[in-house]
Swiss-Prot record:
Transmembrane segments: none annotated. This is Maturase K. Belongs to the intron maturase 2 family. MatK subfamily. It comes from the Eukaryota. Usually encoded in the trnK tRNA gene intron. Probably assists in splicing its own and other chloroplast group II introns. It is found in: Plastid, Chloroplast. GO terms for cellular component: chloroplast. The gene is matK. It comes from Nepenthes alata. Its main location: plastid.
Amino acid sequence: MEELRGYLELDRSWQRDFLYTLILQEYIYSLAHDHGFNRTIFLENAGYEKKYSFLIVKRLITRMYQQNHLILSANDSNQNEFLGQKKNLYSQMISEGFAFIVEIPFSLQLLFSLEGKEIXXXXXXRSIHSIFPFLEDKFSHLNYVLDILIPHPVHLEILVQTIRYWTKDASSLHLLRFFLYEYRNWNSRISIKQYISFFSNRNQRLFLFLYNSHVCEYESIFIFLRNQPFHLRSTFSGAFLERILFYEKMEHLVKVFTKNFQVILWFFKDTFIHYVRYQGKSFVASKGTSLLMIKWKYYLVNFWQCYFSVWSQPRRIYINQLSNHSLDFMXFLSSVRLNPSVVRIQMFEKSFIIDNAINTFDTLVPNIHMSGSFAKEKFCNIFGHPISKPVWADLSDSDIIDRFGRICRSLSHYYSGSSRKKSLYRIKYILRLSCARTLARKHKSTVRTFLKRLGSEFLEEFFMEEEKVLSLILPRDSYTSQRFYRGRIWYLDIFCIHDLANHE
């Protein structure tokens, strides 16, 4: 009982009223926007960067010390001076600063506690490529997988309640509601796609944080329930009192499962279950039977609806057999393939031939999706035939070659872990020929003329970077094997998916 209570209990020291006061500190805005450091991909906003200065920050803090500029009325929001077009910069600055501040208690909890004891947490590499070695190691031994689209829309108030689990700072929560009021109607709903489109240039850090904290909240409880199948069988719901209304929801879940399955949660016992998530998509893979996966499916549906008040339809969760279906995940088509092999065994004067089959985890480049992305960006037509890029025709020859080369190297870098390199060579072919057509269009010549003029140097522009990296992995004297190396290489320095590879 105490063990379960300790898992869900929040440390009171992290619930002090300290977040709101930080919004009045000048250094917060410098840290929030990486002023003087390399900016992150979530904070790229050229227009805002030009307007940033400590003088503007001082004026902003002065205004906040004065009369209530943060009061927002639903009836006169258009007349509010603080939200006017001239004052919109202040609102954006506060929201970016607040996004940085609200991350502080979450970051500190992952590093250490006030008593100096380290919090046990699984260490994971930052690279998104680190997921694939895990899949190769685990999924090849499993049978079924739940292909899950994380439910949305999410009501704004649910996002605020998620933060309430971690901090009791009422002032900060009111400020959070202020920003949610500002950008959307309170009765509206936010979806994952709307996050990307609506907040692509403004306050992306804040709303990504809200969504990720919401997902992290249900993941923490989901993983806890998965790891405690036998404890939950006889545990009184009061053990979950520390989470707001969680104990009531647990009682409801117990009744639901008792009614439908005549058991509680112990039928989820499975030591070979694994969970992986990226953005709005997740997978639950198991070595069990299809019946077990059906139980997990309807458990998740009830879990989201009863605890998070999020409507989730069963059709958003697909049960697939790994040997018969491919997973569309992080711009790869992944599947488990049976790889037959013949082994000859010699024992004294007799020899035996044994047919052996090993499951291997394949990762393929999705040709159809890639052709669609290339056609959308005008590198090829809808049939996959390379075409010129007219919008780049006004650039210098070196800039054109450099742009195509960087895209080619970036995609080659990302898809280096593909099981079959043929699709990767197709990508290079499209970019190389599109580059040649763009140069020919600029100089009003033919493609053949430019290919003859550029020759091998043009090829090196697209392959040199890959060979340079492979030279660090393969022996120095195996130049041929470096150039035509067909093995899988997962680079652990990739933090985001290239736009052309991201089809989700």
